[in-house]
């Protein structure tokens, strides 16, 4: 995946947008706006304060063991 690299604090780079919790992407939400698209497929949404986590799609950048990105394979 181009542009996918490991950043600081054991997470993938800015374009990967993943933290140590594999399979989750984090998007900072400055406002409480929600858009729902129906009929596309199942989506898991969890609101926690101003942070929203959405399950990543298959093939997305996930953080693996030893602070490496998988499938980015950054070391």
Curated annotation (Swiss-Prot):
<dbReference type="InterPro" id="IPR000347">
    <property type="entry name" value="Metalthion_15p"/>
</dbReference>
<comment type="similarity">
    <text>Belongs to the metallothionein superfamily. Type 15 family.</text>
</comment>
<keyword id="KW-0480">Metal-thiolate cluster</keyword>
<comment type="function">
    <text>Metallothioneins have a high content of cysteine residues that bind various heavy metals.</text>
</comment>
<dbReference type="Pfam" id="PF01439">
    <property type="entry name" value="Metallothio_2"/>
</dbReference>
<protein>
    <recommendedName>
        <fullName>Metallothionein-like protein 1</fullName>
    </recommendedName>
</protein>
<keyword id="KW-0479">Metal-binding</keyword>
<dbReference type="GO" id="GO:0046872">
    <property type="term" value="F:metal ion binding"/>
</dbReference>
């Amino acid at each position: 995946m181009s542009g996918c690299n490991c950043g600081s604090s054991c997470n993938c780079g800015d374009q990967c947008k993943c933290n140590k919790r594999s399979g989750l992407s984090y998007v900072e939400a400055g406002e409480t706006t929600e858009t729902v698209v129906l009929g596309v497929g199942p989506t898991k949404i969890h609101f926690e304060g101003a942070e929203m986590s959405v399950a990543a799609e298959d093939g997305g950048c996930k953080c693996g063991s030893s602070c490496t990105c998988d499938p980015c394979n950054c070391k």
